[in-house]
């Protein structure tokens, strides 16, 4: 798979065929940031407080909305307001993994109404092509008002030790991304997918790569998480770095967000030769 990692964000913002990807790279260029904060807190107050304090330094806020003990409509209106105030996108890390009929209901209905507020969601291709088709159908429905502002990341590899998301699984991830490129922004992966080759490559192909498990200080945790530094992640092909505990659990989360912003941006400038 071809990589556009050497191309500056502003050029990708101008040329990208996907409108949400264009917006993502525009925000990154304006804020000089490639940081996505994974705010794995358990109350609405904590989540909105972090989003407000860290908003100026991040491009994306990644949520696990189902771990909130007090989720309500106020949670969503608060997130939407802060997204507009600080110009960041919301990524609900739902990791859809079920049959198509079920994931459509999880995405577009249920208690969480994810399609109404999350710009980005993610899914695994373990159930086969039907899961991507089902999610894409929701976003392309004639009566869905947010079509140009919604996108999917496919979970192509994982940072947990012993992950089975390798080989044929990763190849299928790339194949389905190419098939549904109008809806699929790119991948969540621990490394560049440049060496993964499948049919269907297009000249304007430019999939966005998010890398999780980015931490300036730690090598991992007791539950199998394996960390990378911002420099190693960006140098390895990541367009955006996702950090959770390294930022929100720091003694001063704002200072931590600034440090990750600088480290990630410096690594990006080095990658594009600036």
From Swiss-Prot:
Its EC number is 4.1.1.23. Gene3D superfamilies: Aldolase class I. Substrate binds at residues 40, 62-64, 93-102, 227, 245. Keywords: Decarboxylase, Lyase, Pyrimidine biosynthesis. One of its GO terms (cellular component) is cytosol. The active site is at 95 (proton donor). GO terms for biological process: 'de novo' pyrimidine nucleobase biosynthetic process; 'de novo' UMP biosynthetic process. Pathway: Pyrimidine metabolism; UMP biosynthesis via de novo pathway; UMP from orotate: step 2/2. SUPFAM superfamilies: Ribulose-phoshate binding barrel (SSF51366). It is an enzyme of class 4 (lyase). It catalyses: orotidine 5'-phosphate + H(+) = UMP + CO2. GO terms for molecular function: orotidine-5'-phosphate decarboxylase activity. It comes from the Eukaryota. Disulfide bonds: none annotated. Belongs to the OMP decarboxylase family. NCBIfam families: pyrF (TIGR01740). This is Orotidine 5'-phosphate decarboxylase. The lineage of its organism: Eukaryota, Fungi, Dikarya, Ascomycota, Pezizomycotina.
């Amino acid at each position: 798979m071809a990589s556009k990692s050497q191309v500056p964000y502003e050029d990708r913002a101008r040329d990208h065929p996907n409108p949400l990807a264009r917006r993502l790279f525009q925000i990154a260029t304006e804020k000089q940031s490639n940081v996505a904060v994974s705010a794995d807190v358990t109350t609405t107050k904590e989540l909105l407080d972090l989003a407000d304090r860290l908003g100026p330094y991040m491009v994306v806020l990644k949520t696990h909305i189902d771990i909130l003990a007090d989720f309500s409509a106020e949670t969503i209106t608060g997130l939407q307001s802060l997204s507009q105030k600080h110009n960041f996108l919301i990524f609900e890390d739902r990791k859809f993994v079920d049959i198509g009929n079920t994931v459509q209901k999880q995405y577009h209905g249920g208690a969480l109404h994810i399609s109404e507020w999350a710009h980005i969601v993610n899914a695994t291709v373990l159930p086969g092509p039907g899961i991507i088709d089902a999610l894409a159908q929701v976003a392309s429905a004639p009566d869905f008002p947010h079509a140009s502002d919604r996108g999917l990341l496919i979970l192509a590899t994982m940072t947990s030790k012993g992950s089975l998301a390798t080989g044929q699984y990763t190849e299928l991830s790339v194949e389905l991304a190419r098939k549904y490129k109008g809806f699929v922004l790119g991948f969540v992966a621990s490394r560049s997918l440049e060496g993964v080759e499948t049919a269907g490559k297009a000249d304007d192909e430019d999939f966005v790569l998010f890398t999780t498990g980015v931490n300036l200080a730690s090598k991992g945790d007791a539950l199998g998480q394996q960390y990378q530094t911002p420099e190693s992640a960006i140098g390895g092909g990541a367009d955006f770095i996702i950090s959770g505990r390294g930022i929100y659990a720091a003694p001063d989360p704002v200072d931590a967000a600034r440090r990750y912003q600088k480290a990630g941006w410096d690594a990006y400038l080095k990658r594009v030769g600036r």
